Amino acid sequence: MTDVAIINYGAQHDYPAMLHELANGLHVFSHNPLAHTAGLGSYEHVEDCEFVPYAELRIRQLARTRRFAHIITDNEYDLERAARIREDLGIPGQSARSARQFRDKVVMKQTAGRTVATPRYARLTTIVDLTRFIADNDYPVVVKPVSQGGSRDIVVLRDENDLMAFSRRHWREDLMVEDFVDGEIYHVDAILAPGYRFVASSRYLRDCLGVLSGQNNGSLQLDPAGKLSRRLEEFLDRVLEAFDTPEVGAYHLEVFRTPEDEFVLCEIASRVGGSRIPALTRLTYGLDLHTTWLRLSCGLPVDPAPNTPPAALRGSIGIVPQGRPVRAPQSLPFDWVEHYQVNEQLALGAVAQNSTSNLCFALVRGADTAEVEQRLLQVEEWILDNLIEADGPARLPAP
């Protein structure tokens, strides 16, 4: 029997199905409760799993009586922990050095800067580091935690007034600053392994940071055979040349495209892209990113990577929490909407807390990127015109 330890985050994963050949040797520790656990070697729902060391301690205890072949995780915040366990137990997979290159955004920029353009940046110890950076580089700048995701706790400072307002916030010990880069933002999602290569490129509908100020956002897939997709794929390869990469890797790359048509690294993560990216990929390419990545990581066979042009492209639009008591319509009147979901868990009056906060979201189909974008904007307009006013408290944080 092959034993595999899994530190899980995703609430919908079905590990007995995804890794069915190994099911009775899977030992799963999950941040979110899982519905499909029958047949697993062991399973524990660990409250706040990504914040507490329990899963790591239990895996090390279990390793006294069994030989784990693999330690895997779907969660960016567990990459370093999983790598540390692997190295201590002599298990192949992503190293701690590699995980840190992708997790610490200062180290990430230092690493990527060997092969591609990055914004100017600095790690912050005190407010003086920030003011010196601004004096040297001018406004606007972006201040953010070095290891956070989902646009959480990111602040754009455009002038002295913004700086003074920022100085009233609680100081954190994990901050960095970088130039604000003007331009469109693209994302490239890939799974790379010996004999396997899948790369797909998309453009964000708007700036991800706009969600925090009330802008709706989403993304739209690019034609995989188009010149821009090929350029983005080449940029991904150049970025990864600078990194220590595991034999099997999933990557979510975010790229600025400046008005001068130059690419500048935003960030790269060593995991599957979040939000609607997995769902859009399944609809267009018939590929489950998580299943493919985890099966390859465990040495299990997968179907060949898609290599024919897709019949259609897709995109997503998320309507941000409105900050006032409203409800989203329960359905949409468009036959090209392939999925629509209302966030029933959202408190009335909630406001956005990160780039994935939503009142509702829709996935749409189109013949090409231009039609997808037009339909996303049509859906956005229709939903906003049909919000339902409701009684309730105002300005609660979104879950």
Q: PLM ranges: what are they?
A:
Residues 1-97, 128, 300-303, 367-368, ...:
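ATP-binding N-terminal substructure of ATP-dependent carboxylate-amine bond-forming enzymes
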Residues 5, 133, 294-399:
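Peripheral (often C-terminal) accessory segments that flank ATP-dependent C-N-forming ligase machineries
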Residues 102-182, 193-195, 222-238, 377-380:
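Active-site nucleotide/adenylate-binding loops and adjacent lid/helix of ATP-dependent enzymes
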Residues 145-147, 212-213, 352-358:
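Short, flexible turn/loop "capping" segments at secondary-structure junctions
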Residues 151, 269-285, 345:
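Glycine-rich phosphate/pyrophosphate-binding beta-alpha loops
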Residues 155, 179, 282, 360-367:
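Short, well-ordered beta-strand elements within core beta-sheets of diverse protein domains
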Residues 170-174, 180-222, 230-264, 269-277, ...:
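Phosphate-binding core of ATP-grasp and ATP-grasp-like enzymes
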